[in-house]
């Protein structure tokens, strides 16, 4: 497999991890920041927008995993690349949103 397949799997993991908070907040009926809020990423979007945005992230991640390269759940390297993307999303997004929530930090 070529290197850009692994890069795509990292992006897939990022999309899958990013979809979780949007989807959960959406189906919980809570407002949550999204790219469609005003201002983008800072304002709060309605629950339906977040549920749909979460589903879109899941769809994008799923599509990348199964349409790019030759992904196999039995291949440790493939799964690790998706996990690395999810890990990077968790770290980057938690730092980003923590600094927005607490401007004094």
What are these regions (language model features)?
Residues 1-105:
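Membrane-interface extramembranous regions
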């Amino acid at each position: 497999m070529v290197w850009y397949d692994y890069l795509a799997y990292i992006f897939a993991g990022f999309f899958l991890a990013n979809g979780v908070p949007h989807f959960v907040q959406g189906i919980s009926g809570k407002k949550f920041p999204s790219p469609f809020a005003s201002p983008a990423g800072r304002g709060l979007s309605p629950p339906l927008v977040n549920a749909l945005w979460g589903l879109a992230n899941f769809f994008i991640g799923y599509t990348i995993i199964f349409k790019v390269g030759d992904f196999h759940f039995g291949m440790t390297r493939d799964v690790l690349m998706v996990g690395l993307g999810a890990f990077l999303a968790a770290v980057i997004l938690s730092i980003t949103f923590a600094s927005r929530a607490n401007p004094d930090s």
